[in-house]
Amino acid sequence: MDFVKALLDKKLLLIGNFMLTSGKVSPYYLDLRKLPNHPDIFSFVVSSAVDIVKGINFDMILGVVTGGVPFASFIACKLNKPMGYIRAEKKGHGTERLLEADVDGKKVIVVDDVATTGGSILKAVEEVRKAGGKVEHALVIVDREEGAFEKLESVGIRLLSVYKVSEILNSLIKSNLVAENEKKLISDYMVKNIGKS
């Protein structure tokens, strides 16, 4: 499967001017929250993710709301592992918990869709550890390579990814799928941001 072409065709990779959760402005945006709307691509990505984590010794998978939840659910189902999720902030009703899982004494893999600086994953890891869980691995579909790997490594977490954004963007730049001015914007952004933490 030509993943980059599929991302563009399904408008999951957008070119323009986008504000990221991290506060950075980017010339591209990966809208992976819509990936489950496309079962062929979603299934391909989930199978790739399963191949990455199946050799790891862990007890459960925890999805980061909202982007990580569909991936965590399907990966957990394929591996017959329990699954939970973690919110960014407490809801104002019900149990008012951030963490919807019993992680005490369990080895947990935290799953999200995309990592930029690693802030969302780090917050999830901290909550899991506070609740007695052990986290040594996090998995994302795409690592934007803007510091998440290093930030997580500094707290003992190995960040795994199905794709590195440099692979996606280099493929995009080499293709005829985007205009020359868009290729330049992306290339300039890569030089300034990717691999610089």
UniProtKB/Swiss-Prot annotation:
Cofactor: Mg(2+)
Catalytic activities: orotidine 5'-phosphate + diphosphate = orotate + 5-phospho-alpha-D-ribose 1-diphosphate
EC number(s) on file: 2.4.2.10
Enzyme class: transferase
One of the protein's GO biological processes: pyrimidine nucleobase biosynthetic process
UniProt cross-references to InterPro entries, sorted A to Z: OPRT, Or_phspho_trans_dom, PRibTrfase_dom, PRTase-like
Pathway: Pyrimidine metabolism; UMP biosynthesis via de novo pathway; UMP from orotate: step 1/2
Residues binding orotate, per UniProt: T116, R144
Chain residues that bind 5-phospho-alpha-D-ribose 1-diphosphate: R87, K91, H93, D112, D113, V114, A115, T116, T117, G118, G119, S120
Organism domain of life: Archaea
Alphabetical keyword list: Glycosyltransferase, Magnesium, Pyrimidine biosynthesis, Transferase
A single GO molecular function term of this UniProt record: orotate phosphoribosyltransferase activity
Binding partners and assembly: Homodimer.
Function, in words: Catalyzes the transfer of a ribosyl phosphate group from 5-phosphoribose 1-diphosphate to orotate, leading to the formation of orotidine monophosphate (OMP).
Family recorded in the similarity comment: Belongs to the purine/pyrimidine phosphoribosyltransferase family. PyrE subfamily.
Stated name of the protein: Orotate phosphoribosyltransferase
